[in-house]
Structure formats: C-alpha cells, structure tokens
C-alpha cells in the first residue's frame, strides 16, 4: 500500500494545468502499520514556470528549481519504486486528479490503481461520527 502526497503549482495564469512540483510517498503493509520505505523527488516546472502565490509558500520549494527533474523522469522513478502496487492512499482527492492530469499531459502510462483512498474524506467522516 502506498500513501502519496503531491505538491503542485497551478501557475500564475490560472491555465487549469496543475503542474506537480514534488512527489512524496511512503510504503506500508497495513494502515497504522510501520513505514517500510519512503520516496521523495522534486520536479522542475516545465509548463507553469511562474509560480502561483500559494505555491510560493510551499516548504522547500527551491528544491524543485535547484534539484528537480522533469515530470516524466520523476514519474518513471516513482513507478519503478512503487513496483506493482495497486492500492494507493492520498490525503485529499485532488492528488489523484492532479497525478492523472500530469500523466495524461506528458503522455505517460498511468498507474494501475485497484483502489484509491482519500484519507481527508475518511478523517472528516470519522470526526463527524465522533460528535
């Protein structure tokens, strides 16, 4: 099971393309279990090179410009790291939408996802149920 967290820039021109700047992930066997492995890679912006004001506030953003690789390289490294995993979790539903948008834009083979879970939605339901 892979928990993924993306950071992205929607660009200052509000073009509608959310360009990924960072892919972070951890591998776990079960929810609540130990972290088995980690992945982190910075992506150099190629499309939206002018940052949206919200993207400027992202921590360690300078890594994307200084150490970042193009998205196709970053995604292929992520796929290699994720291997044949088919269960993915993200903090919010936008991560999967943005990932698919970038994969489509760069004409890359998509991840084979059997199940995609949104922790933010689950956490919200849990908090509501506790009241």
Task: Please report, for each region that a protein language model flagged, where it lies by residue.
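Short alpha-helix plus adjacent loop in nuclease-associated cores
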Residues: 116-131
């Amino acid at each position: 099971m892979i928990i993924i967290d993306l950071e992205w820039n929607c660009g200052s021109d509000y073009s509608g393309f959310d360009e990924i700047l960072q892919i972070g992930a951890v591998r776990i066997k079960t929810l609540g279990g130990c972290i088995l492995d980690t992945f982190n890679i910075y992506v150099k912006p190629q499309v939206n090179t002018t940052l949206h004001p919200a993207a400027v506030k992202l921590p360690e953003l300078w890594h994307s410009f200084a150490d970042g690789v193009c998205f196709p390289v970053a995604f292929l490294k992520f796929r290699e790291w994720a291997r044949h995993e088919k269960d993915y979790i993200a903090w919010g539903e936008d991560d999967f939408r943005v990932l698919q948008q970038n994969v489509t834009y760069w004409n890359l083979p998509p991840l084979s996802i059997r199940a995609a879970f949104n922790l933010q939605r689950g956490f919200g339901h849990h908090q509501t149920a506790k009241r």
